[in-house]
Amino acid sequence: ITASKVLEIALTGRDCGQEERAPMCGVPYHAVDGYISKLIENGYKAAICEQLEDPALAKGIVKRDVIRVITPGTIIDQAMLDEKTNNYLCCIYLDKGFGMSYVDISTGELHVTENISLNDFLKNSTNDLLIEEINKIAPSEIISNKLTGNEPVDSMINLSEGLSLDECKEIVLKHFKLVSLDSLGLKDNFHAVTSLGMLLNYLNETQKTSLDHINKLHFYKVGEYLQLDGSTRKNLELIETIRGKKGPGTLYHVIDNTMTAMGGRLLKKWIEEPLKNIKHINLRLDAVEELYKNVMASNNIKECLRSVYDIERLISRIVYGSCNGRDMNSLKQSLSNLPDLKAELSGLSSELFAEIYSKFDELKDIFDIIDKAIVEEPPVSIKEGGILKTGYDDELDELKEITVNGKNWISGLQTKERDATGIKNLKIGFNKVFGYYLEVTKSYLKDVPEYYIRKQTLANCERYVTPELKEMEAKILNADEQIMKLEYELFLEIRQFISSQVKSIQETAYNIAVVDTINSLAIAAVKNNYVRPEMNSKGYMSITDGRHPVIEKIMKNEMFVPNDTYIDNREYRMSIITGPNMAGKSTYMRQVALIALL
């Protein structure tokens, strides 16, 4: 009833005995993704139920079960996701502080943090930190053992019974195949472990499949990055404008020259989590400067990345078991660019690029198996054959030869029967209900030989079979059935092989994202005539001819007037800015903040 209203489809019903009628509604299977997306957008969950056994082999009613529950935070279908935005599922554990874990199951990215309040005086500030962390990651779904007291956040929370610490430890260790929490860096972080255990338990209950792509945990401390509260992020218009729109008018739009979805997501993360460590800042700046000065290398890298698909989300679909041959070819196409990209990296000398080059895996074995196995234009379905190339498997080739020879024989039978019967318009056809048949129009029925067996009568023709046609049909259909079964089994083997390499693929995908993001910043610097800052820890900031990076791009017919800034932590701790309304006071302040972030 609810689905029919939300999806705007007809509500029907079926008698189910005792004068009751079961309400029903349905959608075409091939178009189900669009309807599921609409349900999720309206705040509902969708349970996917499938047959668990072959109907031909089942005894009695075919066994069915829920194989997955799709929720706002567990979407993996790329059509339902923004390619350059993470889709986080967040889990919070509240008890004298908080533990927070969040995951993007479409990429395998997993983060964990915690903050403990030792007394009531710190309780409010701890809660504020939690709300700021939640606002920063902007999750699609939140699970928590308690409400936070913040109305916008609480409206998103699904309350869940908290698990015990021991239960959560067991879940975490089982997932990561470990015997101790030490190697995860969570030895004494009980709030973090509890939130992580609750998160993984929720995923196990809803996804009911392998989560092997979620294999790397990033534990961080709140405050490890520069803290930007919600008001600051909103007013600086980092990712969205004040009106909540993406695109022009944001810092992200000005500096986003990424060529891949992975790079686009990482750039957003870097903007929202500014570094505080000068060494790490200079490491990035060294790499940006190298590409800024080497425009040819920058352009070559850009071209290498142009046809790279979203490897992070592709490998997640493969591990999930929801990929098809087209996903495999998208991965192959992406990997085909890696040798050229690695060659470009070999000519770069900055420490960050040297480190990436030293561990850059071209994943040649994965490229080779896909290239050898998958046809150039595979079908969407993986259970109906037509996926694998000739030459990949000997047994499969033999079966294909049977069908080819059989179909050639059937084509020859048409000519043979026309000559034998004199029926000039006799033709051979096929459908899934009646199989192969000989079709004769009404005007030639008098010429039909006795050995023809009537199969079907239509308005203008009769359809027949012959013993030899039935025999060949059985051979072809049997071979076709075996081909579909064998191709499916071989495809699963290929999928399993690629899934076993998930860590290497994810590491390469991350390295590609870093290169893409660094190159994006270098391109932005060239386009906008930015200069490299000199970082110091002496407590002062000096800006000469500073410009607001966003407003100068919006101004079409006017030139932004650059201005200077100097502040320190001694004599010039404060500047008083005066002027009439709309004179640019807030623009100047935001300009300084954005330059500091850049």
Give the role of each language-model region.
Residues 98-102, 438, 543:
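Short beta-strand motif preference
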Residues 1-290, 299, 303-319, 323-415:
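Charged catalytic and DNA/RNA-contacting regions of genome-maintenance
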Residues 411, 418-442, 449:
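Extended, charged helical/alpha-beta scaffold domains that provide interaction surfaces
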Residues 320, 334-337, 390-391, 417-425, ...:
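Charged, surface-exposed helical/loop "interaction arms" that form contiguous linear patches used
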Residues 458, 462-496:
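Extended, charged coiled-coil "arm/hinge" scaffolds of SMC/Rad50-like chromosome-maintenance ATPases
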Residues 6, 189, 259-260, 264, ...:
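ATPase nucleotide-binding head domains, primarily ABC-like/P-loop NTPase cores
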Residues 366, 373, 380, 436-452:
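Cytosolic, long alpha-helical scaffolding segments
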